[in-house]
């Protein structure tokens, strides 16, 4: 992933603010609707008074005590309310106190958040000469709005929020098309004037389930570090829910409850190839938001009307969002949220402890797309079309008790006992159609039917089916560290985290693993398209890197935890995407031809969901080999032969691409030409280690798949011969060079390191670079073994590269150090990854990984890394506790999945395994490694069995579904037998003197048919 400047972070990561809009002509549905023009008065009294709100910081123009116009939260003061006297092209600002706004030549000095302001706006008793005019703001990063221009000023003449956005900013001038220029005009009676009511957080809350993210203030009021620095409340605090394809982010506002939603296939762009950032490429779009504005009258900005005992949470055990608080009268309010995969909708449920207390106005707003909602009969909807796909969203409000009315502005419910809101959304995208669309005319009815079907059910029924569905996946794998308890709000847990060994630190690490699996389930089900750089969640227009499908590490990392943490089904949208693009659609074959290859397929670094690519690093054609390894790994974990038969043609055609493309070097090996080690060093060189290791894995996997499929592989004898020849003569990308001290003393001079480039020294690279592209051989592959010179060289390369990294890079380093069998170093990287992000790597308070900005791949990389510390099987050898950190003295990891479709559960205490259970789901031969394996009693289906152990490795066999227990502490009791009873012992089976059933190979004192005997 490319670097991003802090300025660009600030540009793309701001919170999207909904603005009242009117329709405008659009091109491809991408241009935002024009903002609504405020009312102008010609003279005299009266007219409409507005807050003039800057979208960048959600603050309004206010008269300050130092005789300036500054930006503060609206509080209803008369000096904050402005009318516009004149016309759009020439008007004056006048507040309710009769003051005007003028451009001053009395400058303001520099502050910690901004440079000196030479021409600040100030209040005056006189009008501004020449007046002001309004023009539509071209910048829409934070929403659609206006720019204010001083008519008498030349050069930089657009009113501008001065300095970094915060509280108390002065107002100066800048050039047009800056996000700090954009304002909207809001009627004070339709705006609280503050981000939320007065909120008092709970002091006593404890979550029902330990695996819960929880907070004592809404995302709407929570403070951002250093005044924001471009990060948004969405990125820092909003909580994600998702059904795998359709999802939402929850803010927990009491005054205005926003549910911001996304759909995985809501992409602008086309299948074409375009320049980087070009229009044809498109981007992942923000679908929109629904708002529930409180009309109860129970809450306000003062302490006597505060919402007290406030808590909002995301329960990972049930995939449920929740907000809870009380009124001054003691009424308890609860709001619950789910994204139901069975129902394919998002559902919000509002209740109160006393009847008749729920009153809201519900509205919808489109996000980064153009659409105006319409309302009728308790429902709201909007729709539109982008360059390729069409979209539709619909909500339905279902109150119990009270009254409901619908007008052109929204849906109002007064005095209800309970309210359920059902939200549906989708597009006409189809991964298998040549146009990438299908059933466009039926889309609106499809969404309407989906919403109606859910609305017919009760909340209890919808919730029950949602939880049952979700837990069938989430409940398979359980990671627990002894002594942990979740009694600290998650933001405080992060702030207090120091990577120590205390219960709070271990709780955060345990929670982070569970969150990774939660995000995998929530972002990767349904449509055959992979999760993107932000999973399925995005709330802004100018999202970083278009929130696209990056093929040089990022999308692959999204799926690293899928197989080992027993979420194999979540891998399928990515695998089916690869298969469809490689075999069914033409684009990836076109990109292969663009690179001079008549056979096979490939894609480049940046990809959209239509097979389209940007022009960035189009020589990164090795992506096809990396993608194909995912096709094979899924087979290794599931042993699904029919699946392998289906996807094998994609593996074979990727191999054909490289069989034809490889060049024979002067040393007699085959090299990948014109390659690149992402994103690092020489931009074009033959024999780069990254590409060589990938092609080695591709060829090895393809040959292994041919062995499995036999004649069903349908490989010609010619191709098979070429494949074997190229594989035998392939440069494996596993050369070493001696370190010369060029980058300092991280490793001794003379140490061997892995070569990143065959023909260039390591000195062509960058010290501490975030990509470890030449270490594919260690992770995610297993091409080098512990105890070898190459293994040691890889470890030296990691030490030399250092621990500093971006968020996703730390995810990779965690896995690399786990494969290096150094659990404490792997946990050290985890410690770094869990530090709060203040402009760089770490996590946000909602545990989103920070590159920066938010990138979800780091969440998945860390989840996989924790799994690798506990169990590894990629080499075919099941390693038990291969890299257990010393801080994790006691705990368990139940329900992991090993290669060969083996379910593995491990318990440990004092850093040593106490029990290991292996369920052999398909009767495979299992090779298991553990340092003290010879000390374990081995039970196969409750039968004590002698097993040969050599070099801490045992080979175990069994029938389909057989369970092997490795008992290290003597605590295991075979099911159904505690001791030998005389009448039960006459069954022909063999027991030891402890009453445990043993097999026929057992030697020693035994009991058979009720008689003791010595078996030699």
Residue ranges and their predicted role:
Residues 516, 993-996:
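Short, glycine-anchored, charge-dense loop/turn motifs used at functional sites
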Residues 193-196, 971-994:
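Residue-level detector of functionally pivotal "anchor" positions at catalytic/ligand-binding pockets or at interdomain
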